[in-house]
Amino acid sequence: MVKRTYQPNKRKHSKVHGFRKRMSTKNGRKVLARRRRKGRKVLSA
């Protein structure tokens, strides 16, 4: 049987895709800047 690959976990989600994680690296800040420029309502998870 094939298991479902997406096993939601709020803590892990934030640790990997969260705002603070994005801010902690140069490229992450680039991501946020891009999303701001595009006008995203939500910048990160």
UniProtKB/Swiss-Prot annotation:
Keyword Ribonucleoprotein attributed: yes
Species of origin: Staphylococcus aureus (strain NCTC 8325 / PS 47)
Lineage, highest ranks first: Bacteria, Bacillati, Bacillota, Bacilli, Bacillales
Stretches the record annotates as Disordered: 1-45
GO MF terms, alphabetically ordered: structural constituent of ribosome
Family: Belongs to the bacterial ribosomal protein bL34 family.
Chain segments annotated as coiled-coil in the UniProt record: none
Alphabetized UniProt keyword annotations: Ribonucleoprotein, Ribosomal protein
Biological process terms in GO annotation: translation
Transmembrane segments: none
Signal peptide feature range: none
Gene: rpmH
InterPro entries attached to this UniProt entry: Ribosomal_bL34, Ribosomal_bL34_CS
Protein name, per record: Large ribosomal subunit protein bL34
Gene Ontology CC terms: ribonucleoprotein complex; ribosome
